[in-house]
């Protein structure tokens, strides 16, 4: 499980992205890169990391389910993910 501080930092970044999204869009359209540069660094969408909703793991996260590969496999084998079954050919 990821440290709580790392998860909290990522949540803060999500809030900042949401807060400055409209302003950032306006500045990009206007081409005002000086004002854009003065916005908080963490308000850029590229700084937000996709994380597993259960464990907080930041790598190998399936966006469609919001789960890391470990939890995805666990729930898929238990039949808790609708429409997901183990491949066999």
UniProtKB/Swiss-Prot annotation:
<comment type="subunit">
    <text>Part of the 30S ribosomal subunit. Contacts proteins S3 and S10.</text>
</comment>
<dbReference type="GO" id="GO:0015935">
    <property type="term" value="C:small ribosomal subunit"/>
</dbReference>
<dbReference type="GO" id="GO:0003735">
    <property type="term" value="F:structural constituent of ribosome"/>
</dbReference>
<dbReference type="Pfam" id="PF00253">
    <property type="entry name" value="Ribosomal_S14"/>
</dbReference>
<dbReference type="GO" id="GO:0006412">
    <property type="term" value="P:translation"/>
</dbReference>
<keyword id="KW-0694">RNA-binding</keyword>
<comment type="function">
    <text>Binds 16S rRNA, required for the assembly of 30S particles and may also be responsible for determining the conformation of the 16S rRNA at the A site.</text>
</comment>
<keyword id="KW-0689">Ribosomal protein</keyword>
<dbReference type="GO" id="GO:0019843">
    <property type="term" value="F:rRNA binding"/>
</dbReference>
<comment type="similarity">
    <text>Belongs to the universal ribosomal protein uS14 family.</text>
</comment>
<protein>
    <recommendedName>
        <fullName>Small ribosomal subunit protein uS14</fullName>
    </recommendedName>
</protein>
<dbReference type="InterPro" id="IPR023036">
    <property type="entry name" value="Ribosomal_uS14_bac/plastid"/>
</dbReference>
<keyword id="KW-0699">rRNA-binding</keyword>
<dbReference type="InterPro" id="IPR018271">
    <property type="entry name" value="Ribosomal_uS14_CS"/>
</dbReference>
<keyword id="KW-0687">Ribonucleoprotein</keyword>
<dbReference type="GO" id="GO:0005737">
    <property type="term" value="C:cytoplasm"/>
</dbReference>
<dbReference type="InterPro" id="IPR001209">
    <property type="entry name" value="Ribosomal_uS14"/>
</dbReference>
<dbReference type="InterPro" id="IPR043140">
    <property type="entry name" value="Ribosomal_uS14_sf"/>
</dbReference>
């Amino acid at each position: 499980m990821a440290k709580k501080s790392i998860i909290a930092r990522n949540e803060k970044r999500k809030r900042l992205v949401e807060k400055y999204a409209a302003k950032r869009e306006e500045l990009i359209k206007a081409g005002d890169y000086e004002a854009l540069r003065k916005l908080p660094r963490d308000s850029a969408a590229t700084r937000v990391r996709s994380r597993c909703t259960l464990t907080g793991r930041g790598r190998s996260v399936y966006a469609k389910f919001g789960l890391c590969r470990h939890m995805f496999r666990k729930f898929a084998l238990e039949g808790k993910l609708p429409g997901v079954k183990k491949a066999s050919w």
